[in-house]
């Protein structure tokens, strides 16, 4: 579960390394984001010369989440870290590579570009 003020790692090569969630999309009272949900993040650490810089604000989608999520077949999926992929205004990834596995729930949410770039889909 991702909420406001949650620190996350970035799983792409956009230049950002660490981000902090500042808003969860989905209505006024929505508190938590799970796998495949969009959030707004603030860049907290970035590499020099990257696409994004520290203090930038951009959209992101959650690709890995520590809190387990139940699937329709009854199984559960969870990861060791909270990770996001940064998105541009059109909803496509800002980076050209994805690091680490991503959840299968992204395919259901129509993030096909992220799924195709990922080395492994769990």
Swiss-Prot record:
GO terms for cellular component: cytosolic large ribosomal subunit. SMART domains: Ribosomal_L14 (SM01374). The keyword Nucleus does not apply. Keywords: Ribonucleoprotein, Ribosomal protein, RNA-binding, rRNA-binding. SUPFAM superfamilies: Ribosomal protein L14. Belongs to the universal ribosomal protein uL14 family. This is Large ribosomal subunit protein uL14. It comes from Chlorobium phaeobacteroides (strain DSM 266 / SMG 266 / 2430). The gene is rplN.
């Amino acid at each position: 579960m991702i909420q406001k003020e949650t620190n996350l790692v970035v799983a792409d090569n956009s230049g950002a390394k660490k981000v902090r969630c500042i808003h969860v999309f989905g209505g006024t009272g929505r508190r938590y984001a799970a796998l495949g949900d969009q959030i707004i993040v603030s860049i907290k650490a970035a590499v020099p010369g990257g696409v994004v810089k520290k203090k930038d604000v951009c959209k992101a989608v959650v690709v890995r989440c520590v809190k387990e999520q139940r699937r329709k077949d009854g199984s559960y999926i969870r990861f060791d870290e909270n990770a996001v992929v940064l998105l541009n205004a059109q909803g496509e990834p800002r980076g050209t590579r994805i690091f680490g596995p991503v959840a299968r729930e992204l395919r259901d949410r129509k993030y096909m570009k992220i799924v195709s770039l990922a080395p492994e889909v769990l």
